[in-house]
Amino acid sequence: MINLTDSEMESLVLKDGFFIKTVADFCLETKSGSTPSRTTNEFWDGGTISWVKSGEVHNNITLRTEECITQEGLNGSSTKLLPTDTVLMAMYGVTAGEVGYLAIEATTNQAICGMICNTKAEAAYLYFSLIQSQAAISRLSNGGAQDNLSKNFIDNINLVVPPTEVIESLNLPAIIEQMILNTKEIFVLEELQYTALAQLSSR
């Protein structure tokens, strides 16, 4: 979608009633996170607030994170608590341009842009749209000079947006819910495998 020419976008608008919006215009708000100081133990020790790193964003559903921060860590840094159904995009590193979908409330580091939408249907539409556009996003980011993205670049990505009733009729949240269930099942199987291997090694 990002790589449509002006004439192609105009054709869509005129012919199908679709229209063009930037990510910033489509979303209620976009935010980047931060990393609470690693030297302040009370920001991390015993933390229960999920904190997502860019390496954990790889076209996936986020149900748990490798690290958590404390309330003090949230209050003592510029990271923000993002609501469930926020869409994520990694801005730096090997996963730059890849997308995630929050199935939990979570904070993120500074290498992630969080995109908050009006509805679950719009969030799901944005998630799948950005996945579809990844190759074009990679080509156009910073003129192709480097792999890193900026929040400003993400805010200005063009989306082809159908009328609200069309987005609702696609029932994309049902696909997201099935992905969440599948992810939970994978976690259960991983835990069973870990338990079985631990029992075998103790014999």
Task: State where each predicted segment sits.
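Non-catalytic DNA-recognition/assembly elements of restriction-modification systems
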Residues: 1-34, 46, 156, 160-203
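Residues that recognize and position ribonucleotide moieties
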Residues: 16, 50, 62, 106, ...
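A short glycine-rich beta-alpha junction/loop motif
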Residues: 92, 106-113, 144-168
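Short, positively charged
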Residues: 118, 122-153, 157-159
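Extended hydrophobic-aromatic, low-complexity segments
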Residues: 99, 123-125, 137-139, 166-170, ...
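DNA target-recognition patches
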Residues: 21-73
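Short beta-alpha junctions and helix-cap segments that line functional grooves
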Residues: 37-40, 100-102, 172
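A short beta-sheet element
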Residues: 53-54, 64-131
